[in-house]
């Protein structure tokens, strides 16, 4: 298996041998292995969707960012999983923005995409997004699962 897939399995299993083994079995049972297949099996968000989501935030497009979020949730991805993956994405984006390019487990193509996307944000905006989405993760008792994430989107996009 490619290194990227093994990295995704390790991240999703959070150190649990049993969970990692279950994810590995699911993936190995597939005839074709590509990023979309692996991501859907691991109930995650693919890199391209994270890029689109970040681009909508960079454009301060509240409506499209929330629609993209709700589309992911309709596909069965939990708000918590979206937040966790987006925080990791933002962390990588921040590192690229400040010139740290090593050992993200990303392809050269994805690193290039992050470098281009980093031009749409300044460091303080990336830090603000990290704080907002971290807060959304902490708000576990919301009556509407995606509400803290929607609020994070609106708060960032509606700020001058």
Question: PLM features: residue spans?
Answer:
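Extended, largely alpha-helical regulatory/partner-binding modules appended to the mid-to-C-terminal parts
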Residues: 1-160
């Amino acid at each position: 298996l490619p290194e990227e897939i093994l990295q995704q399995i390790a991240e999703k299993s959070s150190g649990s041998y049993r969970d990692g083994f279950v994810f590995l079995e699911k993936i190995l049972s597939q005839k074709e292995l590509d990023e979309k297949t692996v991501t859907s099996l691991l109930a995650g968000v693919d890199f391209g969707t994270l890029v689109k989501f970040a681009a909508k935030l960079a454009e301060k497009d509240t409506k499209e960012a929330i629609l993209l979020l709700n589309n992911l949730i309709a596909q069965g991805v939990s708000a918590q999983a979206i937040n966790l993956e987006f925080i990791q994405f933002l962390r990588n984006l921040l590192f690229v923005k400040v010139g740290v390019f090593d050992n993200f487990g990303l392809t050269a193509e994805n690193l290039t995409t992050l470098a281009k996307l980093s031009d749409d944000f300044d460091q303080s905006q990336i830090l603000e997004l990290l704080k907002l989405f971290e807060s959304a993760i902490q708000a576990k008792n919301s009556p509407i699962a995606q509400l803290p994430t929607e609020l994070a989107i609106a708060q960032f996009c509606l700020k001058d």
